[in-house]
């Protein structure tokens, strides 16, 4: 049994365009976030069975903008995840890995207001179970000796992109969201104008992710990932996503 622990940090930015019922532009919502987390990885050496445990906290700074009106809030988010998988070799360079993951996440937003009125947020949380598999290449990612024709890079870089160690993968999954909770109350200064909304994320989604990683130096790996989530029942999430990663070891 091998065990690996570590900490990580991340920064993110998202921007969403909001449209009115008639399709016209209503405004934008932006979110800048910084995260700090820790992880524990366990691997059974003889079978390859692995488990990942992750705990993460995130600080959000959100801004909703429309014509002549802004709304800003800050909040804290948290996430806990337990994921496991068992890889099977189909060929020497192709692997199939069934996976199962449980995730619990929550969000606590500050109250806010704009020119139209106030918004009071409660504490929200949701649980997710993902079942799927990962199919991809299983090539040796050892960088080896440099082959660059440029003298300064001769020992640390490859002559061409085709010489880089590369792995690809695709990951289809089914995601079930349940026990989602969270209230939001909006109103104005007028007495009795307040209304409470209790949106739900409960439902089932189909998720497809694909990625590629390449070792460009002995200690540097670059990766890209893209995916699409489609809701098939309830009020579960739907949309596109993308991610680029840079991994440097010391």
Task: Show which residues each predicted segment covers.
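Membrane translocator/pore-forming domains, dominated by Gram-negative outer-membrane beta-barrels
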Residues: 1-250
């Amino acid at each position: 049994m091998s065990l690996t622990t570590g900490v990580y940090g991340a920064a993110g930015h998202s921007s969403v365009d909001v449209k009115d019922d008639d399709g016209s532009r209503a405004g934008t919502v932006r979110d800048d976030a910084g995260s700090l987390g820790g992880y524990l990885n366990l691997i059974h050496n003889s079978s390859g069975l692995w488990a990942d445990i992750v705990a993460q906290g995130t600080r959000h700074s959100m801004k909703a903008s429309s014509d002549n009106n802004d709304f800003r809030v800050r909040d804290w988010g948290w996430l806990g995840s337990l994921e496991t998988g068992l890889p099977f070799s189909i060929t020497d360079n192709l692997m199939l890995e069934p996976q199962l993951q449980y995730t619990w996440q929550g969000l606590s937003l500050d109250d806010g207001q704009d020119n139209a009125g106030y918004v009071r947020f409660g504490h929200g949380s949701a649980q997710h179970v993902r079942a799927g598999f990962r199919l991809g290449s299983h090539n040796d990612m050892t960088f080896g000796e440099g082959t660059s024709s440029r003298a300064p890079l001769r020992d640390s870089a490859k002559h061409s992109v085709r010489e880089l160690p590369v792995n690809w993968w695709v990951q289809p999954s089914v995601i079930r969201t349940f026990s989602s909770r969270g209230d939001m109350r909006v109103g104005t200064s007028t007495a009795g104008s307040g209304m409470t909304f209790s949106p739900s994320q409960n439902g089932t989604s189909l998720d497809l992710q694909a990625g590629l990683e390449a070792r460009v130096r002995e200690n540097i790996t670059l990766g890209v990932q893209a995916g699409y989530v489609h809701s098939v029942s309830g009020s579960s999430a739907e949309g596109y996503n993308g991610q680029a990663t840079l991994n440097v070891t010391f």
